Amino acid sequence: MKITILAVGKLKEKYWKQAISEYEKRLSAYSKIEIIEVPDEKAPENMSDKEIEQVKEKEGQRLLAKIKPQATVITLEIQGKMLSSEGLAEEMQRRMTQGQSDFVFVIGGSNGLHENVLQRSNYALSFSKMTFPHQMMRVVLIEQVYRAFKIMRGEAYHK
């Protein structure tokens, strides 16, 4: 079992790094965990739609280069399916039962994910209709993956 969190951009703030580190440690009891960061594309403040697409395409190429062919790709998207914590655990368990053991959760940059990445996705997951900073989403995601493993194992975890 391997969980990869693949994200555009680097974590800069110490408090986000500490939170991620804590959940990496907790999650390692259940799965191999890897966090891969790809560089975000430098972009001016006010971009045209064409420039935004170019940025998304370049970031998308970097993301796709890190995904193995056999990986189950779960993209975080505003338009994705919203699940409860139990629902995420059930979805992961269902996929594991089918023999899927290499999960890659993909978090896009500030402009979102390119169509090429969305096409590679096996499952579109949404945490909210709201937009969150990608640094925060990494922490929320890794905590929810950890919680999913606790639920799958029937272990107690605070609510």
UniProtKB/Swiss-Prot annotation:
The keyword Transferase applies. Its main location: cytoplasm. Gene3D superfamilies: 3.40.1280.10. One of its GO terms (cellular component) is cytoplasm. It catalyses: pseudouridine(1915) in 23S rRNA + S-adenosyl-L-methionine = N(3)-methylpseudouridine(1915) in 23S rRNA + S-adenosyl-L-homocysteine + H(+). Belongs to the RNA methyltransferase RlmH family. This is Ribosomal RNA large subunit methyltransferase H.
